[in-house]
């Protein structure tokens, strides 16, 4: 047997205090508020932020009564932006709101201004979306992405619970894994490099930062079997990261789409998720594609699976559905595609119904806006439910 091919692959993540992620969370908190009161809300909510300012803008048609300013301040405060020193003061920052209603041209074509039956509702726009799954982790997600995401989550956890009180909200992680390729399957061998850059108080030493990150963030997250004496650690390599959040960088909704999905694995059609109601197939199409790909792998039909679906605006049926198992399938991809089409309805109205996507509130969508939309063990993430394909 030929030797297995070895290679390095890298995925990154950012935590909830990153400016772009602030914006994703605000946009999805607005979506939650609209859907909680009016499940038929049509929402396309964008957010941007910079020093001392958060702006919410877009197109929203809803019967809900929404206090946009209160949502902005609440989200920013929960993240930890409670003073200008840390990057933003949630109570004192300027909040700008510029919301218009959805274009009636779009509304009549997509949902007939509310008159179309569920199965007739068309896609809110054209586009192509992807779902991906791999058997290399219990979550059926890429290990590089899982570790980078969990490191970011742990950074926030030890900041909020006081274990590392010197931490501030902004931070980034990156993980490089050495893989071997067996056929089309990816087999993780070891963690090659871990990079963490985290915002911190000005009085903490770099030595203390390094010690705490190793002890309280890396060791609890990364399985010991993947670490060895050759693993490289870059922990706050720039030497100083005091200025962060919107004070350090401008933020915008929808700029972390690879972090939101598969860390560079699989493929991406380019459409962002946050702030969009289920008629926007950028979101709902990607969710159903993930459920389909995950179900293929969980059913033992392949070790890896990529599903693509594409749409036209105002047309209910997808233009195409594609599957690629990278040569790992137990049957031809054409047969797996038949099973996918048998078990999954890709029409936007039915995606919304079958995955219960019109239900907002309880931070249902806000939760998705930090630490990834996929591979999460949470009943609100209905698209992670596996269907047995047979």
From Swiss-Prot:
One of its GO terms (cellular component) is cytoplasm. Pathway: Amino-acid biosynthesis; S-adenosyl-L-methionine biosynthesis; S-adenosyl-L-methionine from L-methionine: step 1/1. Its cofactor is Mn(2+); Mg(2+); Co(2+); K(+). L-methionine binds at residues 59, 102, 249, 280. ATP binds at residues 18, 170-172, 238-241, 249, 255-256, 272, 276, 280. Disulfide bonds: none annotated. It catalyses: L-methionine + ATP + H2O = S-adenosyl-L-methionine + phosphate + diphosphate. Binds 2 divalent ions per subunit. The metal ions interact primarily with the substrate. Can utilize magnesium, manganese or cobalt (in vitro). Its main location: cytoplasm. The keyword Transferase applies. InterPro entries: ADOMET_SYNTHASE_CS (IPR022631), S-AdoMet_synt_C (IPR022630), S-AdoMet_synt_central (IPR022629), S-AdoMet_synt_N (IPR022628), S-AdoMet_synthetase (IPR002133), S-AdoMet_synthetase_sfam (IPR022636). It is found in: Cytoplasm. Keywords: ATP-binding, Cobalt, Cytoplasm, Magnesium, Metal-binding, Nucleotide-binding, One-carbon metabolism, Potassium, Transferase. GO terms for biological process: one-carbon metabolic process; S-adenosylmethionine biosynthetic process. One of its GO terms (molecular function) is metal ion binding. Signal peptide: none annotated. Its EC number is 2.5.1.6. The keyword Transcription regulation does not apply. Catalyzes the formation of S-adenosylmethionine from methionine and ATP. The reaction comprises two steps that are both catalyzed by the same enzyme: formation of S-adenosylmethionine (AdoMet) and triphosphate, and subsequent hydrolysis of the triphosphate. PANTHER family: S-ADENOSYLMETHIONINE SYNTHETASE. Homotetramer. Belongs to the AdoMet synthase family. This is S-adenosylmethionine synthase.
């Amino acid at each position: 047997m030929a030797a297995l091919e070895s290679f390095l692959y890298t995925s990154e993540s950012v935590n909830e205090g990153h400016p772009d992620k602030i914006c994703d969370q605000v946009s999805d908190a607005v979506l939650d508020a609209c859907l909680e009161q009016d499940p038929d809300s049509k929402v396309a909510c964008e957010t941007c932020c910079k020093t001392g300012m958060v702006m919410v803008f877009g197109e929203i048609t809803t019967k809900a009564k929404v206090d946009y300013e209160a949502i902005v301040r609440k989200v920013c405060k929960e993240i930890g932006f409670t003073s200008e020193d840390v990057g933003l003061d949630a109570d004192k920052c300027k909040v700008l709101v510029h919301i218009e209603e959805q274009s009636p041209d779009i509304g009549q074509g997509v949902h007939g201004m509310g008159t179309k039956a569920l199965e007739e509702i068309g896609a809110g726009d054209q586009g192509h979306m992807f779902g991906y799954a791999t058997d290399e982790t219990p979550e059926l997600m890429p290990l590089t992405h899982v570790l980078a995401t969990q490191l970011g989550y742990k950074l926030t956890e030890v900041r909020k619970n006081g274990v590392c009180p010197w931490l501030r909200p902004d931070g980034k992680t990156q993980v490089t894994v050495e893989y071997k390729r067996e056929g089309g399957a990816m087999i993780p061998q070891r963690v090659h490099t871990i990079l963490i850059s985290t915002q911190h108080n000005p009085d903490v030493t770099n030595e203390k930062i390094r010690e705490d990150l190793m002890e309280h963030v890396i060791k609890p997250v990364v399985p010991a079997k993947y670490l060895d004496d050759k693993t490289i650690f870059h922990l706050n390599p720039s030497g100083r990261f005091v200025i962060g959040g919107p004070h350090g960088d401008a933020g915008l909704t929808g700029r972390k789409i690879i972090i939101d999905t598969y860390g560079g694995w699989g493929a991406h059609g380019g459409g962002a998720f946050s702030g969009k109601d289920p008629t926007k197939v950028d979101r709902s199409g990607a969710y159903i594609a993930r459920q389909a790909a995950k179900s293929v792998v969980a059913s033992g039909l392949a070790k890896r699976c990529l599903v693509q679906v594409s749409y036209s605006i105002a047309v209910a049926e997808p233009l195409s559905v594609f599957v690629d198992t990278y040569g790992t399938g137990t049957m031809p991809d054409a047969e797996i595609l038949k099973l996918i089409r048998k078990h999954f309805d890709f029409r936007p109205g039915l995606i919304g119904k079958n995955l219960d996507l019109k239900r907002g509130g309880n931070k249902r969508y806000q939760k998705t806006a930090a630490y990834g939309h996929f591979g999460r063990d949470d009943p609100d993430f209905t698209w992670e439910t596996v269907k047995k394909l047979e």
